[in-house]
């Protein structure tokens, strides 16, 4: 991808924002080197890794990168066999600790979704507990070795403490006895040796070695003779300490050197994970989504937003290109926000092709392009002595030399800066040439000739940016299929130009041109209304589809439970009948044996006894089956009341009755989070088992202890989250909690809005607010209960 388009579309600003989320210097460098990938496979893989990281962030929070530093320099030194500094070893030790924690963090639990790419990277991490432990035991901070690093160091430092204590006692004694000769009644240290501040005129009164003097020369720092031997002993111990520390550092450096290949691999993986999670964190704060990537030149962006415009000011637009038409001409006045649309499309393409989530709605599509070209703005300099037209044409010539059917070309005010007639003709010729090559093209223009060109040319479409004449400002909403209107007369009138001047101007323009402009305005108004209607219809359609899928899933789940219950009953019935059949076969065999023996009176008695046994077995089997059926059904309800608990045998689950029987004999019941209609005659009396009674009593006694101060609603849809939060708030209210926290995550804000709407109507809620810094920010809602 050419560097010019990255600069013109301000992709470097995006990289600076992403860099702010990276921790290590190496990961920050990876971000700054980021640019569109060369193959569609690479684009999809890097987008997928970003989406996986975002999913983990939403489910588990931030990865454990605490204490991580860039250790590239330390690794380079260790590879050469050099002795590492205390700081270098500490940072490698911290990196190994992060390796261990990351390995645990990325390990997938059975119930969690698979993250193919990140789990594959996790498998490359090798935990070096021995090296990590040896470093953490020996090093306390970036400039301190622990006493416990070795027995010898411990012994040396203990001796140092004793000697320092002795010399302090001695020097304090000397200070007290020579107060009249001293500048201050304090001792100090010069060159690791204890000295006292003696007035220059009394230096002969305090025998010893002069180590330093004050800037004025009035004070001499003298080491009293009585301290020389003690200072020498301390100096020797300090030299031994230094030698032992160097030995420990050398020993740890050798340990690192022996494992340097593994350490290097671990660091490279961690840097890449740091880079990936930086992309995901930026995408999360941006409200970005995973785009669908195609190779057909199709761009379909829904609710696309420019990522560098603040969220409270940016206006989203639907931008599409590549299916019905390959060239989009955005027409209208120069102040109409056309360039913003152009840059939004190009920048979103660059972001997606670089593995970043895009600021658009779910299921938006981008196309893989080998090159994106842009001629936007005036980039000529005074030194070059180029006019606006010459500057643009220089760029266009370069584009024409390289563009092909795998290119996306962006033109801002194509043909501007010269005679309008010649400029329009030249613009049409350039567009035709690039269209013949199969390029995808977006261009802005204010030439009327290009509006007509788009209207009569196949695969070329007009578009405009909606303009509010009342406020004299663009709304920045893109209207595809409607050419732009100049609005020159309306704007001039709003700014105070006299009507007679405007009317004179209209006379200069042909009637056909005025009618054409009026037609455009009418089209604009109709298009805006149609677009608004389409948006509302799409929202309703999506909601209907969502509810349809949700209830279809619930129905299938109920059907599955019912089928399982029936299957279990059939299996048990078959077992009873098989057992009875086996016993009956045995009895019949005995009867046949008796008949072969002859019919004596004794034999007849035995035969009748066996027949009796057979009848009893069959009756017993029938009774057991009937009893099982009755047990499964339970006792019928004599009376149905709203709010009562009942048993629904078809799903073998207790339900709550929500309505009286209707004219079909059906009632609505709630089973868990599901609401379903069933026949009233199918409901049975719900009986509590002893165990359930015990649990209820225990819950009543321990209610306060069991209601947590917060609940995590992330991962749920709005309906399930509201139901769960409602039940939780009831429990918290009964338990007497005054304040609770609902964790809904930041995400797109849909879940937060649903929770907020529910809280406004909840009977137990006194007030609620978003979390503050340290509480979870906008990812949580703090609720004050009545």
UniProtKB/Swiss-Prot annotation:
CDD domains listed in its UniProt record: ABC_MutS2 (cd03280)
Keywords: ATP-binding, DNA-binding, Endonuclease, Hydrolase, Nuclease, Nucleotide-binding, RNA-binding, rRNA-binding
Keyword Ribosomal protein: no
Domain Smr: start-end pairs: 711-786
Any one GO MF annotation of this record: ATP-dependent DNA damage sensor activity
Keyword tRNA-binding attributed: no
InterPro entries named in the record: DNA_mismatch_repair_MutS_C, DNA_mismatch_repair_MutS_core, DNA_mismatch_repair_MutS_sf, MSSS, MutS, MutS2, P-loop_NTPase, Smr_dom
Enzyme Commission code: 3.1.-.-, 3.6.4.-
Annotated binding of ATP, by residue: 332-339
GO biological process: mismatch repair; negative regulation of DNA recombination; rescue of stalled ribosome
Subunit architecture: Homodimer. Binds to stalled ribosomes, contacting rRNA.
Function: Endonuclease that is involved in the suppression of homologous recombination and thus may have a key role in the control of bacterial genetic diversity. Acts as a ribosome collision sensor, splitting the ribosome into its 2 subunits. Detects stalled/collided 70S ribosomes which it binds and splits by an ATP-hydrolysis driven conformational change. Acts upstream of the ribosome quality control system (RQC), a ribosome-associated complex that mediates the extraction of incompletely synthesized nascent chains from stalled ribosomes and their subsequent degradation. Probably generates substrates for RQC.
Family per similarity comment: Belongs to the DNA mismatch repair MutS family. MutS2 subfamily.
Annotated protein name in UniProt: Endonuclease MutS2
Originating species: Clostridium perfringens (strain 13 / Type A)
């Amino acid at each position: 991808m050419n560097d010019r388009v990255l600069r013109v579309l301000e992709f470097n600003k995006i990289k600076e924002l992403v860099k702010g989320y990276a921790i290590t210097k190496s990961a920050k460098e990876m971000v700054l080197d980021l640019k569109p990938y060369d193959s569609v496979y690479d684009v999809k893989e890097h987008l997928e890794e970003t989406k996986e990281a975002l999913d983990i962030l939403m489910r588990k929070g931030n990865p454990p990168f605490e204490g991580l530093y860039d250790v590239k320099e330390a690794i380079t030194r260790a590879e050469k066999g050099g002795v590492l500094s205390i700081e270098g070893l500490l940072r490698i030790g911290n990196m190994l600790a992060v390796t261990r924690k990351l390995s645990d963090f990325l390990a997938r639990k059975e119930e969690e979704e698979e993250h193919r790419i990140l789990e594959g990277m996790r498998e490359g991490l090798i935990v070096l507990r021995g090296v990590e432990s040896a470093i953490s035991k020996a090093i306390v901070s970036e400039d301190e070795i622990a006493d416990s690093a070795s027995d010898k160091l411990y012994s040396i430092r203990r001796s140092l403490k004793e000697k320092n204590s002795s010399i302090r006692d001695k020097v304090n004694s000397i200070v007290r006895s020579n107060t009249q000769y001293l500048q201050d009644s304090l001792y100090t240290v010069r060159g690791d040796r204890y000295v006292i501040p003696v007035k220059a005129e009394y230096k002969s009164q305090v025998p010893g070695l002069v180590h330093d003097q004050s800037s004025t020369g009035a004070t001499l720092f003298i080491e009293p003779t009585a301290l020389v031997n003690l200072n020498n002993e301390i100096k020797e111990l300090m030299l031994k300490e230094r030698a032992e520390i160097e030995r420990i550092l050398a020993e740890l450096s050798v340990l690192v050197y022996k494992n340097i290949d593994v350490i290097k691999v671990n660091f490279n993986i961690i840097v890449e994970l740091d880079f990936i999670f930086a992309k995901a964190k930026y995408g999360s704060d941006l409200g970005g989504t995973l785009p669908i990537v195609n190779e057909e030149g199709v761009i379909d962006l829904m609710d696309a937003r420019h990522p560098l415009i603040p969220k409270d000011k940016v206006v989203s637009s639907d931008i599409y290109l590549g299916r019905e038409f390959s060239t989009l001409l955005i027409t209208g006045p120069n102040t109409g926000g056309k360039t913003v649309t152009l840059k939004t499309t190009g920048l979103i393409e660059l972001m997606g092709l670089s593995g970043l989530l895009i600021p658009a709605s779910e299921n938006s599509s981008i196309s893989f392009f080998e090159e994106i070209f842009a001629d936007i703005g005036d980039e000529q300099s005074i030194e070059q002595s180029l006019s606006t037209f010459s500057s643009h044409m220089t760029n266009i010539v370069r584009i024409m030399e390289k563009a092909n059917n795998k290119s996306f070309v962006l033109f801002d005010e194509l043909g501007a800066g010269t005679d309008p007639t010649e400029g329009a003709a030249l613009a049409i010729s350039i567009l035709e040439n690039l269209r013949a090559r199969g390029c995808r093209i977006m261009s802005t223009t204010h030439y009327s000739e290009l509006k007509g060109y788009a209207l009569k040319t196949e695969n070329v479409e007009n578009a405009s940016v909606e303009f509010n004449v009342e406020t004299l400002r663009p709304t920045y909403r893109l209207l595809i299929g409607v050419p732009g209107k100049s609005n020159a007369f309306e704007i001039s009138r709003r700014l105070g130009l006299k009507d007679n001047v405007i009317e004179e101007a209209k006379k200069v323009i042909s009637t056909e041109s005025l009618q054409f402009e009026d037609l455009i305005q009418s089209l604009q108004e109709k298009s805006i209304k149609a677009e608004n209607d389409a948006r509302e219809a799409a929202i309703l359609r999506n909601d209907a589809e969502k509810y349809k899928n949700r209830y279809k899933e619930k129905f299938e789940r109920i059907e599955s439970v019912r089928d399982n219950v029936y299957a279990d009953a059939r299996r048990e019935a078959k077992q009873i009948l098989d057992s009875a059949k086996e016993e009956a076969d045995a009895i019949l065999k005995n009867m046949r044996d008796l008949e072969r023996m002859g019919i004596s009176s004794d034999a007849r008695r035995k035969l009748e006894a066996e027949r009796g046994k057979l009848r009893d077995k069959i009756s017993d089997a029938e009774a057991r089956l009937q009893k099982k059926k009755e047990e499964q059904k339970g006792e019928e309800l004599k009376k149905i009341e709203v709010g009562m608990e009942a048993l629904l045998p078809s799903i073998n689950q207790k339900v709550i009755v929500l309505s009286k029987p209707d004219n079909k004999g059906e009632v609505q019941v709630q089973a868990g989070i599901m609401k379903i209609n069933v026949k009233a005659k199918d409901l049975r009396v719900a009986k509590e088992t002893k165990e359930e009674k015990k649990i209820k009593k225990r819950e009543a006694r321990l209610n306060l202890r069991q209601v947590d101060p917060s609940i995590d609603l992330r991962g749920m849809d709005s309906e399930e989250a509201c139901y769960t939060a409602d039940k939780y708030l009831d429990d918290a209210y009964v338990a007497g909690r005054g304040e609770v926290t609902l964790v809904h995550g930041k995400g797109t804000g849909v879940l937060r809005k649903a929770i907020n709407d529910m809280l406004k109507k909840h009977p137990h809620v006194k007030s609620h607010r978003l979390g503050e810094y340290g509480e979870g920010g906008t990812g949580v809602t703090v609720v004050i209960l009545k």
